[in-house]
Amino acid sequence: MFFFKTLNFFCLSLLFCTYTYSATYKKNNEFQLAKSGNVDAQYNVAMNFLNGEEGYPKDYNQAKRWFEIASKQGDASAQNALGIIYLRGLGGDKDLSKAEYYYRLAANKNHGNAQLQLALILLNSKKSDNLKEAKEWLEKASLNGNIEAKDKLREIENK
């Protein structure tokens, strides 16, 4: 009986601490910095919402909102993240044209993953004019050290 009372008390304490911790994310320094316009903090807040970490609830719409705010300030990682969100349909429907748009923004800022993902979108579109552009993005991603891009480029050239 003592064991069950102790276990019950422990579970209730843990539940209370988790609730209290998650309710206070709006008061933390990072959130306040994000609200004041700090682009790095905006990206971090978005990642916390995306993954449900650091006391933030998992909320794709809030993640998308904060990534969009950081993206408008030119943050390539936020733009890449928006590409992922729209490509996978996190928090809504998949939107390939928006994914391509955000990947292109980040790719133009030399973001290696965005360059790879943009190339893959172009390759999957099956349009012949896109093959040349896709190869160019794969080459750029390869120069950025993206191994998957190097492999894909080799695969295309061997066809």
Model-identified regions with their sequence ranges:
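Terminal, low-structured helical/coil segments at or just beyond the last alpha-helical repeat
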Residues: 137-159
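N-terminal leader/linker segments that initiate helical-solenoid repeat arrays
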Residues: 18-50
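Hydrophobic face of amphipathic alpha-helices that form TPR/SEL1-like repeat modules
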Residues: 44-51, 81-88, 92, 117-124, ...
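TPR alpha-solenoid repeat register
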Residues: 41, 78, 114-116, 149
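Bacterial N-terminal signal peptides
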Residues: 8-17
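Short helix-capping/linker turns of helical repeat alpha-solenoids
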Residues: 36-38, 52-53, 72-75, 88-90, ...
